[in-house]
């Protein structure tokens, strides 16, 4: 009986110690994880629509990234900052011209907003898509012309 408990405890300790190793196992190679989602930074310059199509082609259920809570925002900020420091990054938020509200491309609810001060400003009445800004260390949003080219973040 004592040996069974010892072996069981040993296996339990081993399982917990390995749980942090390979934390991105459920994500394909080149992707990183947060909770149940996988993300990939794309080092191509594309318009918002081109970036969205790329994400859809890259992975089944792929979209430009939605950001639904502060923890996700901080994780993405940390990961993007490891790769880039002066480049804004497209995310999956855009202004619905029909409804005049901001919507995530994946259909999830906009539960929080993280606009930079003075944003969204719809400069020249042409800014309907959103980037994470490098000057905020990728924590804040700015509306941009959807036809501008930026690097981007995919999610599935």
From Swiss-Prot:
Glycosylated residues in this chain: 35, 109
Tissue: Expressed by the venom gland.
Gene Ontology CC: extracellular region
Disulphide-bonded residues: 27-38, 55-154, 129-146
Residues binding Ca(2+): 127, 142-143
Every C-type lectin domain range: 34-155
Signal sequence annotation: 1-23
Motif Mannose-binding per record, residues: 119-121
Source superkingdom: Eukaryota
PROSITE patterns per the UniProt record, alphabetical: C_TYPE_LECTIN_1, C_TYPE_LECTIN_2
GO MF annotations in UniProt: carbohydrate binding; metal ion binding
Keywords for this protein: Calcium, Disulfide bond, Glycoprotein, Lectin, Metal-binding, Secreted, Signal
Subcellular location: Secreted
Family from the record: Belongs to the true venom lectin family.
Function noted in UniProt: Mannose-binding lectin which recognizes specific carbohydrate structures and agglutinates a variety of animal cells by binding to cell-surface glycoproteins and glycolipids. May be a calcium-dependent lectin.
Protein name per Swiss-Prot or TrEMBL: C-type lectin lectoxin-Phi1
Species the sequence originates in: Philodryas olfersii
């Amino acid at each position: 009986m004592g040996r069974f408990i010892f072996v069981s405890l040993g296996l339990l300790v081993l399982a917990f110690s390995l749980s942090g190793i390979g934390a991105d196992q459920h994500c394909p190679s080149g992707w990183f994880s947060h909770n149940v989602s996988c993300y990939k930074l794309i080092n191509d310059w594309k318009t918002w629509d081109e970036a969205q199509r790329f994400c859809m082609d890259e992975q089944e259920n792929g979209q430009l990234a939605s950001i639904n809570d502060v923890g996700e925002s901080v994780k993405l900020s940390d990961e993007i900052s490891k790769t880039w420091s002066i480049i804004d990054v497209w995310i999956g938020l855009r202004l619905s011209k029909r409804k005049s509200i901001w919507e995530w491309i994946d259909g999830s609810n906009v539960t929080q907003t993280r606009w930079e001060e003075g944003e969204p400003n719809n400069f020249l009445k042409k800014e309907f898509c959103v980037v994470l800004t490098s000057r905020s260390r990728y924590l804040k949003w700015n509306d941009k012309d959807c036809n501008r080219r930026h690097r981007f973040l995919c999610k599935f």
